[in-house]
Amino acid sequence: MGKKRGTGLGRSLQRQRGSERRGASSWLHASEVVGESGPERRSAVEQSPLEEFLATAELAGTRFVAERLNIQFVSAQSRTGLLTAQEAQHVRQLHEENRQFLRIPRRPYWDRTTSSEDLKQAERESFLEWRRQLAHLEEEKKLILTPFERNLEFWRQLWRVIERSDIVVQIVDARNPLLFRCQDLESYVKEVSNDKENMILINKADLLSEEQRAAWAQFFEKEGVKVVFWSALAECRRLSGEVKELDADSVADDLSDSEEESSSQEEDVTAEDSAESTSTGSALQTENQCLLSDDDSSDEYEDCEDEEEDDWQTCSEDEGGDKVNAIAPKSMENRTDIVSMHHVVQEQNRNVKNFSHLVQRNELLEIFKTLHSGPRVKDGEVNVGLVGYPNVGKSSTINTILGDKKVSVSATPGRTKHFQTLYVEPGLCLCDCPGLVMPSFVSTKAEMICSGILPIDQMRDHVPPISLVCQHIPRNILEATYGINIIRPREDEDPDRKPTAEELLTAYGYMRGFMTAHGQPDQPRSARYVLKDYVSGKLLYCHPPPGIDPDGFQHQHERCPESRTVQASGPVKPKKNTKAKQIENVVDKSFFHQENVRALMKGVRATMGYRPGSGLVSVPAPSAGSVVGKPWKKHGNRNKKEKVRRITKHLEN
């Protein structure tokens, strides 16, 4: 047995006294004192961004506390880059509250005594202040503005066009007129002169139905703005069709005359024959000359692409800008009497409501002549200034009105460096302004891409704009347009939900054959094709006026989706798609699929009488189709590397 130990009462008392001493207050320092050789004695000439941030926070006395149980559920809609209903309502409210700050730059006051250098300096200062206001609006209010023109020279061209024009026409896209309309431009026109008139020309109006055009006409009527619905491409096709019909009629007349001439040659004598043919030839020549003269009188704008720019009727200005020298045509007449004749028509147009039908070229020119009633910038002449975004059809409108390609058509702003004036007829002059991108409010960048403001080929994230397309275009329209079958919603999802961007692009990529190197659908490439179809109008969505339900405004979505296939292949009865209304149940489909019921075995099979570990066994005579080969050969490695798409092909049905 060992030695008997004591009770250890003294040690327990010492431990108790030590614990009381540690818990009591003390005058000693409780914080760590950094020695002279510590890290704070080091020279800090260069610091990393993290070290600089931590040092600044330490000097400012900022403390960082870890946040726990900060759980936030992310909905499926937020992953698409789109706004929820509450967020969209909040953004629209902010847009309305800050609408008055969305202005265009003003030209400073000037007169005959203002020198050129003083005017340019004042313009630069005013433009710089305008840029600062927009930057403050984006930073402080957290609003998204469309890309706008930042070159002062283009705004100078706009100022000159407004000063020289009697009527300022804004050309907007019919699918979203409010996005391309600048209300502050209308206010600035009235600030320059109260005698000037504003008008909105809604281009691409053939994409709208009669009910949709009537709704927009009523909305702008309440706003007190004159609107005209116009389609440059449709009118150009109509005019070219009329020219072709005239050419066909002239060719038919020539053929009929030649047939009559040949029949007369068979009946008459040879001498009379020659005389009649000579007279007929002269008659044909005279008729052709009359036909050419009629064409020249009816259409004054023959194809003159080879003409130089100096041949156009252009206006030039001096350095001060107080004189307007125009090279008018020689045949220009005084329009004072004609203006007095149309004075009554102008008063009637002011009282008549906005009409909703598509106007033709002659009707549009008549509106230009009769809209302005006050004193004009130049006596006996109506100057119409055309202003608009790029890619809204401004150049196409000018070319259709003139009947010739006078202006280059381009979707890139900056093609036209200087404004130019083009005479349509004596007394009516079009003043073409360079394409300007004016500041406007948008909710997301996806909206700018779908509106054609941002280039599609330069986008980096394709999911938000494609998700916006899926929200606007119904599932059946997408399937009928591209001939695809988009995957159905699952059993636990809403059967009427919109397709996602991944579902649409996957189906489109499989159909077009746009695949990546790994055998998967190329979604970014497919997204560019779909977005270009949306911008061009193949996938049509029209924004309604404020206060109208967007879903009930889409009359074109109510049409039969098989109409395109019927027009392309004739009146063939389309096959009924039995899977269109089925809901995909992945569990049931995988369970009851017969291709999934299979048995797998690993190892060498008992063939040719060999079985591992049992030696030679009696095997019935194999048939010709069951002979596999030598069991010791590793033929099982064949087709080992299979593509995932080929293996899971049965899951796509």
UniProtKB/Swiss-Prot annotation:
InterPro entries in alphabetical order: G_CP_dom, GNL1-like, GTP-bd, P-loop_NTPase
Binding residues annotated for GTP, in chain numbering: 203-206, 388-395, 432-435
Highest rank taxon of the organism: Eukaryota
Comp. bias (Basic residues): 631-653
Catalytic activity of the protein: GTP + H2O = GDP + phosphate + H(+)
Subcellular location: Cytoplasm; Endoplasmic reticulum; Nucleus, Cajal body
Gene Ontology biological process terms, A to Z: nuclear export; protein transport; ribosomal subunit export from nucleus
Disordered as annotated region, ranges: 1-47, 248-323, 621-653
Enzyme Commission number(s): 3.6.5.-
Domain CP-type G intervals: 155-439
Function text: GTPase required for the XPO1/CRM1-mediated nuclear export of the 60S ribosomal subunit. Probably acts by mediating the release of NMD3 from the 60S ribosomal subunit after export into the cytoplasm. Functions as a GTPase. May act by mediating the release of NMD3 from the 60S ribosomal subunit after export into the cytoplasm during the 60S ribosomal subunit maturation.
Domain notes: In contrast to other GTP-binding proteins, this family is characterized by a circular permutation of the GTPase motifs described by a G4-G1-G3 pattern.
Protein name: Large subunit GTPase 1 homolog
